[in-house]
Amino acid sequence: MVNWQTLFMVSLRRQGSSSRYRYKFNMENITHQVFPRCKQAFKKTNLSYEYCDLEGVLYNISLTDLQKLLLRDINAPREHAFKIVRTDLTQKSSKKRIQHWERIAPMFDHPLSLYEKLFSEMDEDFKPSFEWQQLIRVRCKDDKLKLQRVIWPKSIFSNFCRGIGVKKSTYDRLLEQNNGEVPMFVNPANAKPLPLFQVSDEAMIGEFDGIGIFPYFVDKHREFFVTEVDKLKTKIASPLCTLNERKRIEKANAGRILANEEGKPFYLDANSATTRIAGGNVVTLKQLLERSVSHKTLWSKQSNKDRTCPGDILRATILSNDFSIRQLRAEFCKNFILYNIFTILQRNKKSIRSFSGNDNAPSFQFSWNVWDSYIWKQYQETESMKIPTDQASLINYKTKYDSFLHDLQTYSALVISEMKWNQFSIFQNDETTLSRFEHITLILQTVLTKSKMIRIFQPNLYKFMQDDLRPTLMELVGFTESINATIEPGFANEQSLQSANGLKKLANQLLYFEQEIYGEKFRVNRPIQLRPITLSANYKIVILDKKNAIPEIFQTLLKFMTQITTYFVKDLSEVELHGHMHCIDKKMLDKSKFMYLYEEKSNEEVKAASPQKEKIVDNIIGLLSNDEEH
């Protein structure tokens, strides 16, 4: 499992020295770019809208419902804008502003209208979305029989109910209590009779007492109606509820419930629901925004006028399906890491030649390293994935994005290492030759300005990167074909990619050892202070390569990756040359590669024995590293 706080520290140590490139100095501006974009969009006379019905204030929306809205945002046509339709309001009034719009709009990729629309103002073609949303109490006309928890949709659809479905055990009990006659219940909204039906699929009711039968919306509910007349009635629409009818349903309300992506009831006490609100009962947008205030030091300076959690972080948290503050911290780390990757290009704009598609750009020969090919292969795989349309595909898509971002962060660390190693030659170019940095630029600018995944999870940062990099955008004929050729099937390419995967493992473990040495604490209540780099003087990293399989270029690259002195040896006896230092951690990377972290300690410090479990692990790694391969 990725430790995003460790990767955040790795990124923080490699950020630009100038404040103009620092995360906190730019995040408020990046988020606020939403406002002029919205203003510009709503000036259009022929703007198309995505109308989203909502029963209540957007600021108080449940995070599950907001996730559904964001899924619509992901899949809506690019030129559309979003407008909220309030189904709980009927009185006509002047334009009603969305409460805390300036904190909510940055969570959307599409422009979000500042003003809500009343349901009564919509034309007849508009139909609110049908979802199971609550539990209500229903009773017989004489009040003798009651069902305390019946699954029910949005209140506005109550007039469409044609009966109550119950399990066999409940049906038999009610029959017995009513002297053998099938009881008739009453719709709380309009007092119309609701016949009782026995449901064969008891899973749709779960632990509750029953479910409203709505054949107009749920095809499966039509099987309860057998005569031709009754079948015909199921296809006839009923009027949507008036305000008074909805108030009656509100009085009968017995709790909240949700609908899953298949439209089936989703229970709040189910295990999968519990994990989504782990780490605190964060179930509404209001609660998430309020809880995020305690973390404002992470993304803002004291001088910032707006210290609200950036919309990209809130959006990614909700789309992660883990509605916790712990997850919000992780999404902050990812946002920070992506921004710092972007600054590699931003800080070196003067070294990038601009070749637009209209220029007569020369035909360059491209030269790619295996770490270039590896990250490009990961990028191509992410681009080939389908855009998520439901919760299940969203979870899988988000997992892939996180994995790709981890790889991209490793690639950026390798790039920075390469820039330190070849600090002069990396920028050298001429009329027929691309510099090494221009090769890197072609990859990074493509990923940062064209990635579907980055746009989905970090839309504000994505648009900012596009705008900022546009003046120096390199568009070279043959670039894509050239880099694609390095990842095509074939033994040589496959071998290169395996080699790159090995480099990734080495680099990641090196970075984790680096964090173990510096050990800065991830704080949310005050600015994070980095420890001095001179601390690394007391440490050494030894990489045991028994087969001598790590290429020399990899060794040099890894040595420049960190301030910690790093050695490569092919025999364990060579490690003993550093016997004046004491091993404090070790990691087995594969059967022939091991990494050791040494610290210079006095004899008194070493006397404390290691915990028994750590000794066992150390012994296993020791045996494996000493094992002779035949």
Swiss-Prot record:
Organism: Saccharomyces cerevisiae (strain ATCC 204508 / S288c)
Record bears the keyword Mitochondrion: yes
More info: Present with 1360 molecules/cell in log phase SD medium.
Taxonomy, superkingdom: Eukaryota
Localization: Mitochondrion
GO molecular function, one term: RNA binding
Annotated keywords: Mitochondrion, mRNA processing, mRNA splicing
Function according to Swiss-Prot or TrEMBL: Appears to be specifically required for the splicing of the terminal intron (bI5) of the cytochrome b pre-mRNA. Can also stimulates the splicing of the omega intron of the precursor of large ribosomal RNA.
Primary site of residence: mitochondrion
UniProt name for this protein: Cytochrome B pre-mRNA-processing protein 2
GO biological process: Group I intron splicing; mitochondrial mRNA processing
Mitochondrion is among the record's keywords: yes
GO CC terms in record: mitochondrion
